[in-house]
Amino acid sequence: VRGGGKVEVELPRPSADFQDVRVVAYPASAVGRAALTAADTRVTAAGTAAGAQCLIDGDPATELLFDGSPEAVIDLVTDADLDLRNITVWPARRPIRAEAELQVKGADGYRTIASFGIDRSNPNIEVGFYPYAPVSVSVAKTTGREFRLIVRGAGKDTGFAEVQLSSLPRVERYAEKTFAKMFQSPLPYWEEYQWRDQPVLDDASLAVDPAEVVDITECLDGDRLVWEAPAGEWVVMRTGMRPTGIQNSPAAPEGTGLEVDKMTPAYLQHHFDAFI
């Protein structure tokens, strides 16, 4: 939102059972070009169905499916330089496990700047409440106009909904780090929740400064935000919680239901007194 006066806006509620925790705002990053878009980028692909342009249309309902070839190649070409710092892939709503390689074209041809796995093979919410969560991978600042994403081992009729190449930094593997998407079997090995250090950010001004984050929770009434915003461009973030949908198991039918909130002592005590 643009500050310098009163801001009045309806904030979307993710679901009926959503419970607000905090509404915060922070200054938007001052970057000239945030990401490749459908308006400035041409997308072509081999080893897929037709219609690769849907990968950057901003609509997760449109999907590009792979045809079962051992390798699929997706080229994204733009007319102006992009300072790439992150790639985020939104899988199609179909189980997928594959290996990916991101390349940029230079004077000597394409070179690889990131290799990463994509594992959304188990959509059961027992292993993450966001079954087809995006895969976020950071790269050291890389400037280019022609990028290539090579996908190997993806099965026929799996695919991607969106591919975002961005100049803005993003936490790598944030879905996994917040347990929105966990290890894909119930028995992870010890190393499954360890991650590499992502590349050091080259421009500190692109990161959110904690000192500049403003708590505007009291400005929210229902779904309507009314805020006297300071001058500048601001990002408003509504945060909250909702049940994951996981039910306790094993249990007798009369004892089956949503798991108790183990982070709130009063609720946990009530559960203990009622059932133990």
Task: List the model feature ranges, each with a label.
Residues 154-168:
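Edge beta-strands of jelly-roll/beta-sandwich modules across compartments, strongly enriched
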Residues 91-98, 155-157:
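Extended, low-complexity, turn-rich repeat/linker tracts enriched in Gly/Pro/Ser/Thr and Asp/Glu
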Residues 79-86, 144-145:
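Extended extracellular/luminal ectodomain segments enriched in beta-structured repeat modules
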Residues 1-4, 144, 226-227, 266-276:
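Substrate-binding cleft of carbohydrate-active enzyme catalytic domains
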Residues 90, 124-125, 253-274:
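The substrate-binding groove and active-site-proximal loops of carbohydrate-active enzymes
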Residues 3-81, 92-96, 115-129, 169-210, ...:
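Disordered, acidic Ser/Thr/Pro-rich linker "stalks" and the adjacent N-terminal cap
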Residues 96-108:
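Short, surface-exposed beta-strand/strand-loop-strand elements in extracellular ectodomains
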Residues 116-158:
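Beta-sandwich interaction modules
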